[in-house]
């Protein structure tokens, strides 16, 4: 059986990589993928702690996070497509103002 701390280390490493991607990268699509990596690292920790303590709440929280992430991706990709049509760029720095 894999020890709990391996899952925690994996979650922390993925979280740091995702946070670095959100803070450093300038491409909106890469920032969105880094945000997904952040949320999936949290899911790994939820499931690991839920399994370690024989509790299903970790899995339930992970399912909720996956559902919220799916909705977030749908909205973000819609905004991204509209942005590419209007501004013809995916760089965060080029998009300074959005009109309603």
UniProtKB/Swiss-Prot annotation:
GO biological process, any: ATP synthesis coupled electron transport
Annotated localization: Cell inner membrane
Pfam families documented for this protein: Oxidored_q2
Primary enzyme class: translocase
TM ranges: 4-24, 28-48, 60-80
UniProt xrefs under HAMAP family: NDH1_NuoK (MF_01456)
Protein name: NADH-quinone oxidoreductase subunit K 2
Protein species of origin: Rhizobium etli (strain ATCC 51251 / DSM 11541 / JCM 21823 / NBRC 15573 / CFN 42)
């Amino acid at each position: 059986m894999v020890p709990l701390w391996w899952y925690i280390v994996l979650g922390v490493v993925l979280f740091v990589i995702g946070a670095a991607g959100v803070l450093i990268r300038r491409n909106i699509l890469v920032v969105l993928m880094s945000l997904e990596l952040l949320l999936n690292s949290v899911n790994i920790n939820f499931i690991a702690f839920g399994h370690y303590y024989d509790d299903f709440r970790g899995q339930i929280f992970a399912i909720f996070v996956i559902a919220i992430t799916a909705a977030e991706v749908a909205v973000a990709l819609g905004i991204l497509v509209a942005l590419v049509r209007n501004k013809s760029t995916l760089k965060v720095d080029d998009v300074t103002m959005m009109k309603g």
